[in-house]
């Protein structure tokens, strides 16, 4: 689960992390009061969407002006103008895709007198089962570009959760950022604060880009991006309360109601599979035969008929789907339950695209019988390779 920048900063501030003062704004008429509360003389008006690259992004609407999604204002009148232009407009960035995202919230923040910009992030390193720090002197830019062009400027190290963050970790951050004296002490303190927030809130990723040194000699978090481990949200109702469903894919929201593992993709072949490994293999073989999957969908091992029907309806709700591949290897998940769910869903919503079904495992004969006697126009497949070839051929009109 992701949250907005202003929410991330408020959360980090609870752990003592230094941030600039700011006020979230949902209506243009509230911008004036927000700016006056902060005092100025310089304000930063920031679009709040779940995507990076906001500063270099462009709005679709001409009425939003030709500036990006993060704007510097030198008067309250300018703050008000930017708020009117940006709220409700569609911002396109390198991470939103061509459709962009509508800006429904702004964050008006005190301007900072910046001397240096750095990069600092924490994430879960699944290979080592530790929390990894990624640190670079190259802040304010895409860290992927830095990794590609000048990888020597990125320093990484891990913290063992059994011992937690220690003094030498903070010193490692200060050294990587080439800080000394009081700034080094600030970096050591910040390292502990960020780690404590990361662990306490069960974050999956915490990215500070940029972390700045002001001309007054203070470290400050200028932008923050936070993702949480969805499996731990039941422990954090205060985090769940921050969720903004308008920033999420409607199909993914619907899938979460049925505890389905669903991720929308950009392809045209919808997939319904049981098991994450088999789902990834199914997506790979679709790509092998020259097409792209429209989604990742794992119905899990104990799905009911109703859950399977819901999954099928979510797939068919995607207008980009031109064909559907159901690939089930029945263990705990029984093939007849899958068949009943698919038949029920098709009878309810109709079937306007080719459907290939490959069933194997528990109750496979009963599952195949249910589908064959349903009267539906379903293409059966004997194995995964056969299934992939059939759905690709059907979608291409072969």
From Swiss-Prot:
One of its GO terms (biological process) is tricarboxylic acid cycle. It catalyses: succinate + ATP + CoA = succinyl-CoA + ADP + phosphate; GTP + succinate + CoA = succinyl-CoA + GDP + phosphate. It is an enzyme of class 6 (ligase). GO terms for cellular component: cytosol; succinate-CoA ligase complex. Keywords: ATP-binding, Ligase, Magnesium, Metal-binding, Nucleotide-binding, Tricarboxylic acid cycle. Substrate binds at residues 274, 331-333. Mg(2+) binds at residues 209, 223. Its EC number is 6.2.1.5. Its cofactor is Mg(2+). Residues 9-254 form the ATP-grasp domain. Binds 1 Mg(2+) ion per subunit. The keyword Ligase applies. One of its GO terms (molecular function) is magnesium ion binding. InterPro entries: ATP-grasp (IPR011761), ATP-grasp_succ-CoA_synth-type (IPR013650), ATP_grasp_subdomain_1 (IPR013815), SUCC_ACL_C (IPR005811), Succ_CoA_ligase-like_bsu (IPR005809), Succinyl-CoA_synth-like (IPR016102). Heterotetramer of two alpha and two beta subunits. Succinyl-CoA synthetase functions in the citric acid cycle (TCA), coupling the hydrolysis of succinyl-CoA to the synthesis of either ATP or GTP and thus represents the only step of substrate-level phosphorylation in the TCA. The beta subunit provides nucleotide specificity of the enzyme and binds the substrate succinate, while the binding sites for coenzyme A and phosphate are found in the alpha subunit. Belongs to the succinate/malate CoA ligase beta subunit family. HAMAP family: Succ_CoA_beta (MF_00558). This is Succinate--CoA ligase [ADP-forming] subunit beta. The gene is sucC.
């Amino acid at each position: 689960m992701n949250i907005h920048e202003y929410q991330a900063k408020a959360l980090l501030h609870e752990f003592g992390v230094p941030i600039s003062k700011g006020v979230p704004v949902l209506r243009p008429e509230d911008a004036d009061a927000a700016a006056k509360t902060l005092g100025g003389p310089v304000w930063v008006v920031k679009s709040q969407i779940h995507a990076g690259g906001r500063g270099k992004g462009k709005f679709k609407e001409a009425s939003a002006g030709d500036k990006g999604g993060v704007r510097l204002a030198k008067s309250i009148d300018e703050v008000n103008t930017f708020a009117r232009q940006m709220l409700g407009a569609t911002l396109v960035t390198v991470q939103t895709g061509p459709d962009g995202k509508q800006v429904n919230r702004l964050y008006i923040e005190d301007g900072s007198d910046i001397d240096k910009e750095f990069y600092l992030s924490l994430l879960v390193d699944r290979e080592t089962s530790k929390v990894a720090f990624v640190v670079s002197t190259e802040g304010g830019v895409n860290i992927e570009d830095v990794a590609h062009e000048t990888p020597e400027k990125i320093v990484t190290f891990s913290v063992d959760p059994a011992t937690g963050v220690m003094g030498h970790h903070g010193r490692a951050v200060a050294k990587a950022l080439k800080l000394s004296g009081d700034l080094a002490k600030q970096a050591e303190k910040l390292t502990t604060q960020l780690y404590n927030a990361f662990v306490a809130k069960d974050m999956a990723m915490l990215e500070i880009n940029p972390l700045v040194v002001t001309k007054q000699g203070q470290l400050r978090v200028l932008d923050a991006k936070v993702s949480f481990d969805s499996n731990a949200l039941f422990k954090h109702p205060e985090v769940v309360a921050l969720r903004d469903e308008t920033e999420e894919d409607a199909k993914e929201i619907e899938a979460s109601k049925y505890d389905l593992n669903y991720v929308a993709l950009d392809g045209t072949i919808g997939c319904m599979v049981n098991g994450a490994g088999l789902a990834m293999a199914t997506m790979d073989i679709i790509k092998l035969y020259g097409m792209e999957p429209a989604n990742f969908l794992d119905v899990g091992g104990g799905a009911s008929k109703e859950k399977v029907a819901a999954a099928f309806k979510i797939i068919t709700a995607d207008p980009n789907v031109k064909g559907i591949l159901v690939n089930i290897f029945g263990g705990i998940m029984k093939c007849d339950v899958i068949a009943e769910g698919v038949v029920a869903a098709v009878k309810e919503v109709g079937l306007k695209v080719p459907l290939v079904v490959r069933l194997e495992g528990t109750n496979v004969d009963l599952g195949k019988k249910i589908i064959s006697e349903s009267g539906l126009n379903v293409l059966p497949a004997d194995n995964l390779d056969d299934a992939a070839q059939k759905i690709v051929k059907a979608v291409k009109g072969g």
